[in-house]
Structure formats: C-alpha cells, structure tokens
Amino acid sequence: MSTKPLILLLANSKNSINRKFAKALEQQLNAELIELVDYQVDFYCEDLEKDHFPEKIKSLVRKLHDHKTLIFVTPEHNGFVPAFAKNTIDWMTRDTQYGKNQFLKELDGIICCVTPAAKSGGKTVLELLTKFFSFSGLNVKGAVLVNGYHDGFDFQPFITDVQKLI
C-alpha cells in the first residue's frame, strides 16, 4: 500500500478551478492524481449491473485500495457533486470486493470543494460526502472548503490545511 496520497478529481470540465486545485495539491504533496472523468460508465441501472459489471469500476476501486489516504476534490453543482461523479460513485458502491457498500473500507480520506462563491452549496457538498463516504467505510479525517475563488487566488493556505489532515 502506497503512503503517497491519491487525489480523485470529481470535476469533468477542462477549465475547472477544482482541477487547478487538484494539480496544485499533486505537486505540493507529491501525490498521485486520477480524474474520475476517465472512469465514466453508463448510467447506473440494476439491469445493467446484472448483465455486466464495468471492469473499469472494479479497477478503480482496487486502485483506491493501493493507497492509504484519498483526497477527493469536487466542485458543487447546485449543492451537490457533478452528475457524472455521482453516477460513478453509485457504481463503486455496488462493487463488493471490500464488502457490501464498503468500497472505501479502512481508507483515510479528506474531502475538498473549491467554489467561486463566498456562500455556496460547497459546505453542503462537504457535509453530504462526509456522511456518505463514512457510511462507505472511509475514515474521514476532515474537509476543506475553498470558497471565494477568483483569478490569482492563492491556494497555499488551503494546501496547508490539507497537509495538516494527512
């Protein structure tokens, strides 16, 4: 198991401010970065699951378990995670390699959200993901809200916050 943190980017926009933050974390923390958009699959449906469980989801869950610490970086879309990310997470919950609904079992995690708004759904996203990921076996070490983002924004204080949680 790698001691190098694994960053999971839950944004699918090429110009996402969350991508910028994830890349800054990757460099400063000497972490590995994967983008959930690379693991997109069909919209979850029980019928699809019975016919063929996506191998790329099984592979992704195994990759998560190659690391002790996960750092989730997500935008907020109307107070929730992006739809494509929610779908991929739904599929991951159906993978029983580590127990029913335990795809994050025995892993440590930090959840981050970057938003341009001073007051936003970012806090709600962090609360929801903290509860959900805890239910899925993750030991949530903390959450970092980066709000009020603008051009020229300094991520360093927030990177330091993440470092303290690792």
Curated annotation (Swiss-Prot):
Task: Keyword check for Cell division, yes or no.
Answer: no
Q: Which InterPro entries match?
A: Flavoprotein-like_sf (IPR029039), FMN_Rdtase-like_dom (IPR005025), NAD(P)H-dep_reductase (IPR050712)
Q: Which GO terms describe its molecular function?
A: ATP binding; FMN binding; oxidoreductase activity
Residues annotated for ATP binding in this entry? 117-124
Give TM segment ranges.
Answer: none
Write out the entry's keywords from A to Z: ATP-binding, Nucleotide-binding
Q: Which residues form a coiled coil?
A: none
Recorded GO cellular component terms are: cytosol
The entry's protein name is Uncharacterized protein MG342 homolog
Native organism is Mycoplasma pneumoniae (strain ATCC 29342 / M129 / Subtype 1)
